[in-house]
Amino acid sequence: MNVTDVKIRRVVAEGRMKALASITLDHEFVVHDLRVIEGNSGLFVAMPSKRTQEGIFRDVAHPINALMRKKVEDSVLEAYAIREENGEASELELAALEATDPS
């Protein structure tokens, strides 16, 4: 499975969250609301989550192995970096990221 499209929406609020992202997998399945977060060790990608009635945040969607997590994170962070370099106000679309697939 490959990340075939990434859309970045910059967040204009103060705080650690820098952007929201949507990814398309194999041109067939979209996952919205991934978050680009500034952590203590740099940027990372948080999966979309929902608060339970108990107040605990639970991922709505997430990769089930390290390879897919790396593909998602690398694709989103690359799109975010390009978006920041270009300083564009509109959404950035990165298509055909299949070239980053090691297989």
Swiss-Prot record:
It comes from the Bacteria. Keywords: Cell cycle, Cell division, Septation. GO terms for biological process: division septum assembly; sporulation resulting in formation of a cellular spore. The keyword Cell cycle applies. PANTHER family: SEPTATION PROTEIN SPOVG-RELATED. Belongs to the SpoVG family. Could be involved in septation. This is Putative septation protein SpoVG. It comes from Exiguobacterium sibiricum (strain DSM 17290 / CCUG 55495 / CIP 109462 / JCM 13490 / 255-15). The gene is spoVG.
